[in-house]
A protein has these predicted regions:
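N-terminal activation segment of mature serine protease catalytic domains
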Residues: 3-50, 60, 105-106
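Generic short N-terminal amphipathic or hydrophobic helices
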Residues: 4, 9, 16, 24-25, ...
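Catalytic nucleophile loop of clan PA
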Residues: 46, 174, 186-209
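Short, solvent-exposed loop/turn segments that connect beta-strands within catalytic domains
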Residues: 50-57, 198-203, 215-218
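C-terminal cap/linker of serine protease catalytic domains
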Residues: 205-267
Length: 267
């Protein structure tokens, strides 16, 4: 697939928000939008609200190597550390919304009685989880916001390095291809699962996975803006595996997507 970003012939986007304003927003996010996860070592996660029926479902997004299907099946208890407090949750099938080892991502529901913390969630227009492999003809209009992401765009990561306080790392987008992001932000152990955001408009565009073997760049996954609305007819949006291809469910675009997202009915 041709790299869509290269086709635009745009090197750097204008930064409409001053660094001072950006740092103020980052300070707010540092306190209650991300957490350190103590499980299989230490990693980072961030809080998002995803659309479900007529409401937004609060979840934590992290990597599959931080929380995996074995943790769910074993009902493991894990601790999430925020700057303003700690949350302990027991993993089970009712919490699991999505996990995929190949894509290295996990989404876990956060319940109201899990905490009394003032969590600030990334919401719908901040970006949300999905992965696509579409040519331009197949692209639905809700992917148009991707046209506003440029190579060499200034970005930052919010993360909890291992045994350290929260850390902000700045860098540039080096490449976007299909669902993959390459960037050059400075990373440390424990950074996996960090949100990747644009400096110019604070949009959440990705999740950091790890560094390359040669350490020439760092790897992440793309989070798509304006996630597909759940169908009023089909109460669950089922995303299934079809021959390993990253394409969308037939009801939406005659195809389907890697992995399975099972949003269960409310009791």
């Amino acid at each position: 697939m041709v790299d869509r970003m290269k086709e635009q012939n745009i090197s750097t986007s204008p930064e409409s928000i001053s660094l001072k304003q950006t740092e103020k927003i980052i300070e707010q996010m540092k306190n209650n939008s991300i957490c350190r996860i103590n499980n299989h070592g230490k990693g980072t996660g961030f809080f998002v609200k995803i659309p479900y029926k007529l409401r937004l479902l609060p979840v934590i997004i992290t990597t599959n190597h931080a929380i995996n299907i074995d943790d769910i099946q074993n009902n493991k208890i894990i601790s999430l550390y925020l700057n303003n407090g700690k949350m302990t949750i027991k993993l089970d099938d009712n919490r699991l919304r999505y996990t995929n080892e190949k894509l290295d991502i996990t989404i876990i529901e956060i319940k109201e009685n899990d905490h009394n913390l003032n969590i600030k969630y990334f919401e719908l227009d901040d970006g949300i989880i999905n992965y696509f492999n579409l040519n331009e003809k197949e692209r639905p209009n809700y992917l148009d916001d991707l046209n506003n992401i440029y190579l060499d765009e200034s970005i930052y990561l919010l993360n909890y390095p291992k045994n350290k306080d929260i850390f902000v790392s700045y860098g540039k987008l080096l490449n976007i291809n299909n669902s993959d992001i390459r960037h050059n932000c400075n990373i440390k152990k424990g950074t996996s699962g960090s949100p990747i955001l644009l400096i110019n408009n604070q949009k959440l565009i990705g999740i950091h996975f790890d560094s390359s073997n040669q350490n020439k760049y760092n790897k992440g996954g793309l989070l798509i803006y304006s996630i597909i609305e759940f169908s009023k007819i089909k109460k669950n949006l089922l995303l299934i595996n079809k021959e390993g291809k990253n394409i969308i469910h037939q009801q939406l675009l005659d195809n389907c997507i890697i992995g399975e997202l099972d949003i269960k009915e409310d009791e």
